[in-house]
Amino acid sequence: MKIICVCGMGLGSSLILKMSVETALKQMGIKDVDVEHVSAGTMEGLNHDIIVTAEDFRDEFPGRDDVVFVRNVVKADEVKAALEEYMKAKGLL
């Protein structure tokens, strides 16, 4: 499975989000997941299963069903809850 963490520039918040996603996955006992952080402009060419991004970027992803939106990218427990909800809904858990 591949998860990409996306922000406007692909540096600050996406890197923090990547670390939160990795922590959440570890807590969930999910292994063998490739997690990357990228900018919104460079993500289109990347293969991925799930996109994780901040709630602020909701308008950047209209009509997509592969996106998990998170309000606070620093809080691993919030990221974990959002990922669990998404993965259960998609039959990935």
Where are these regions (language model features)?
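Conserved active-site segments centered on acidic
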Residues: 2-39
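Structural signal for conserved beta-strand scaffold positions within catalytic alpha/beta enzyme cores
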Residues: 5, 37, 53, 68-71
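Short, well-ordered coil/turn elements that cap or connect secondary structure elements
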Residues: 30, 62-64
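Short, polar loop motifs at secondary-structure junctions
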Residues: 39-40, 52-59
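Acidic, metal-coordinating helix/loop segments flanking the phosphotransfer/catalytic sites
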Residues: 41-46
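Conserved acidic residues
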Residues: 49
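Ser/Thr/Gly-rich flexible loops in soluble cytosolic domains mediating phosphotransfer, phosphorylation
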Residues: 66-93
